Amino acid sequence: MRILGLDLGTKTLGVALSDEMGWTAQGIETIKINEAEGDYGLDRLSELMKDYNVEKIVLGFPKNMNGTIGPRGEASQTFAKLLETAYNVPVVLWDERLTTMAAEKMLIAADVSRQKRKKVIDKMAAVMILQGYLDSLN
């Protein structure tokens, strides 16, 4: 069973995919979206869902440090409902606090240029979200 991991932003959607055994997460791509206009890249997501026979989605759920849900968390909840309706698969909201910061630190430590980091940060965050979920299962 393959699981898709997503990191939702206002302009991009980071995408990661599990291996068939559900042990590791790999970054797939970053999809350009426009949240303000309701464009969430669903056409591309549909292709990925079919190509990889995805049976579950793990969506990053940004909470405030005190555990409350702010505007970005509410946006993720709304997006989760949209995904469940569009694809008829379970969507798990996974606490993503600090994943983008951790991903950026990893890329800096790997001496990745600022320009390249900007292109891959959301995909890396999606990997960290999905890997955290997979680790919790195993």
From Swiss-Prot:
GO terms for biological process: rRNA 5'-end processing. The keyword RNA-binding does not apply. Gene3D superfamilies: YqgF/RNase H-like domain (3.30.420.140). InterPro entries: RNaseH-like_sf, YqgF, YqgF/RNaseH-like_dom, YqgF/RNaseH-like_dom_sf. The keyword Transmembrane helix does not apply. It is found in: Cytoplasm. It comes from the Bacteria. It is an enzyme of class 3 (hydrolase). Belongs to the YqgF nuclease family. Could be a nuclease involved in processing of the 5'-end of pre-16S rRNA. This is Putative pre-16S rRNA nuclease. It comes from Bacillus velezensis (strain DSM 23117 / BGSC 10A6 / LMG 26770 / FZB42) (Bacillus amyloliquefaciens subsp. plantarum). The lineage of its organism: Bacteria, Bacillati, Bacillota, Bacilli, Bacillales.
